[in-house]
Amino acid sequence: MKRKNVWAAIALTMMAAVVAGCSKEVSNPDNNTEELHQEIIVNPVELPTSLELTRAELEMVKSSNEFAFNLFRTAQDEKESQILSPISITFALGMLNNGAAGETQQQINKVLGFADGGAEGINDFCYKMLEMAPTLDPLTKVMIANTIYMNEPYELMPDFILKANAFYHAESETRDFFDGETRDVINKWAADHTEQMIKEVLKEDEFNPLSVSYLLNAIYFKGNWAKKFDKAETRDEHFVNVLLEDETEVAMLTPQPMMHQRDKFDYCDTDDYQALRLPYGNGSFVMTVLLPKTDSRAVPKVPTAEVWEQLNQRMHSTLVDVKLPRFESDTDINLVPVMRKLGMVDAFSPYTADFSRFCVWSKARIYIDLMKQVAKIKLDEEGTEAAAVTVIGMKDGSAGVDGYPLFHANHPFLYVISEQKTGAVFFIGQFTGR
């Protein structure tokens, strides 16, 4: 029996609009990390911030959106609701990409949509977002943070540290991963930078004390609707799902708290979608909801970046009767198979990965062993709160699968007993299991 949820992709598309749509961004000339994370005082008469983008920067936004929709199309779950932050992945991978070289770096560039701009283009894009997104709307709270935890005795390349600090405002901390506290420290960092929405990004069985490092990005968004829903208007109504049993579609009606209002909104109608844009605060951030027309019960087809651009161009203000579920959704996803399908292959193998610009230890074969994201969204009559943390765990392939050489004598072998200083052989033998 296969269950389809119409909101599975819609919730993700919302996050793409909220987060990937943050192509407007924070000014922090003193590079003060604390200042980046302070909530800005509300000013009810503040007008939308004007963001002037060069042609190159507009191309960066387009490239980022291309990755966003490709990512969700590849990761889309046909049964469950889902929430992802493409831009959080871009931050985490973009930071790490400064330690990559050769084909590994080229694959990362291409997957993120920066085949032409390269690592420098990703750095510029992320810096622009980091600097500007938090200050676009004083009515909306946006926080972006990056960090790196290194395991002793590994050291980061000086040039990597320089770029991580300059473009991502990332600080690195070296710890003994066997101290029994590092996982808690990482999870606390995630919680602190998402207003406690993401309290555990690394589960106990996911944290490896033999890892070389963990790179993290956290993004947090909280915005009140410019036109709030009246709670008195919220009613439980039927929500249509489809059950597939023996190749037969059976409609299942489930009650959902449905918010309601009638007002003027940006809206467009195409052959494939009804699209509605709901603004937050002063209008600098919006949520765009895509409702499929061909089959209102099916998981929506994820649009391309080009279709997304066309939808935005066709939007027009009109009176709309809106019903939208009040809901919460969270996702904990392993990104390794997703990124492989998108074309980022070499980075996940100690035999093909080239992170020679990441770690000082020349003999190390650094590769990505873990890449995941935890994301959450809450949507109600007041507005939306959403957060995501992306973590990338690096391993040393030259030290064996678990950080040390593997010597499993599980087939015939020779043995020698000798005097240590001279090497004089006292006994020599073999063991064949018989």
Where are these regions (language model features)?
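N-terminal secretory signal peptides that target proteins for export/translocation
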Residues: 1-3
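Detector for small/aliphatic-rich hydrophobic stretches
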Residues: 5-7, 11-14, 20-177
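Extended hydrophobic
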Residues: 215, 274-290, 400-434
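Internal alpha/beta scaffold segment
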Residues: 292-316
